[in-house]
Design a protein with these regions (language model features):
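Catalytic-loop region of hydrolases
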Residues: 29-102, 107
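Short, surface-exposed "cap/lid" segments of acyl-processing enzymes
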Residues: 84, 89, 98-137
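Gly/Ser-rich "nucleophile elbow"/oxyanion-hole loop immediately N-terminal to the catalytic nucleophile
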Residues: 98-108, 178-199, 220-223
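Conserved alpha/beta-hydrolase
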Residues: 135-155
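Alpha/beta-hydrolase active-site loop
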Residues: 163-185
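Gly/Ala-rich beta-loop-alpha elbow adjacent to hydrolase catalytic centers
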Residues: 200-204, 208
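A conserved short beta-strand
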Residues: 221-232
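Accessory cap/linker subdomain of secreted extracellular hydrolases
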Residues: 231-299
């Protein structure tokens, strides 16, 4: 279990030790490359922003507790591994509670990692778009909000490995490592405790379930999951999802099928080629999943 606490005397020595340990045990996985501030708000502006955003999407019957904190929203660039186990650059965002009043004792906040839903374009992620309501609400409630872009999205090169368990788990775990390192050794205002919450919706529901399993399988000595709530994910890929994809009925978002197909062909080359699965007039679709075409265009 990681317990992070800043002290003037041991911060440098501990940082050197952790860097050496990281090279020995983890390679470069989880190494923090850079941070970039995207936005910051005090608690009053955070509450105003939340109210304005909620007013556009829900009725006045919907209510949440007032924000207790403002926030700093950062883009994080870090090292993870790609689908072949090679070192790979990935990005994501972290939003940390902002405390503006003086004489407040050190507060250590829990981490909540949110795995986002299905996107096709590399730019359709928080590290590119910037502020949105969910990190404002959750950081305002006192969570360190973490949102990985995943492999193949944001600044990450290559195709996104859609609906593949292992790449989700490694991308999330390594971003959590980078966030913990940043809080421990590069920003004395940021202190995290050992609580870890996992959440996700749609693709993020599957990514959350995958990450939960991988943490329990491989990283239980490093992370202790407090609560996990995957939502609306495609968990039964070989069962229900296969039936849905192969039924002879129109599907409202047909890009899902080639998205999964091309990701699996990329990850499991032994299962065949695009030409073996698609009619000749649809083979060109493989080039459209480059991160620069929208789901609407592909549909």
């Amino acid at each position: 279990m990681f317990q992070y606490k800043h002290t003037a005397n041991n911060q440098y020595q501990t940082g050197i030790f952790l860097a050496i340990l990281s090279c020995i045990v983890f390679g470069a996985r989880g190494d923090l490359i850079s941070t970039e501030i995207l936005a910051t708000r005090n608690v009053i502006n955070t509450q105003t922003y939340i109210e304005e955003e909620l007013a556009q999407i829900v009725t006045d019957m919907f209510a949440i507790d007032p924000a207790q904190y403002g926030y700093w929203l950062y883009k994080i660039t870090y090292e993870t591994i790609d689908i072949h186990g090679n070192i790979h650059i990935a990005t994501g965002t972290v939003s940390y509670p902002r405390v503006d009043w003086p004489d407040v004792p050190d507060q250590a906040f829990p981490i909540l990692s949110y795995q986002h839903g299905t996107v096709v374009e590399k730019s359709d992620v928080t590290s590119v778009i910037g502020e949105w309501i969910l990190p404002a609400i959750l950081t305002g409630a006192g969570y360190v909000y973490v949102e990985p872009d995943y492999l193949g999205l944001g600044d990450s090169e290559g195709m996104h490995p859609y609906q593949l368990k292992e790449p989700y788990g490694t991308a999330v775990v390594d971003m959590l490592r980078a966030v913990r390192y940043y809080a421990a050794f590069e920003n004395e205002q940021f202190v995290v405790n050992d609580q870890l919450f996992l959440a996700g919706y749609s693709e993020g529901g599957y990514a959350t379930m995958a990450t939960h399993q991988i943490i329990e399988r491989d990283y239980s000595d490093e992370f202790d999951i407090t609560v996990s709530f995957p939502m609306a994910g495609a968990y039964s890929l070989s069962g229900i999802m296969t039936d849905v994809m192969l039924e002879q009925q129109p599907y409202g978002q047909p890009f899902y099928f080639p998205y999964i197909l091309f990701a699996y062909l990329n990850f499991y080359p032994s299962i065949g080629t695009v030409e073996q699965y698609l009619l000749p007039e649809y083979v060109f679709l493989a080039d459209w999943f480059d991160g620069y075409h929208s789901s609407g265009e592909i549909n």
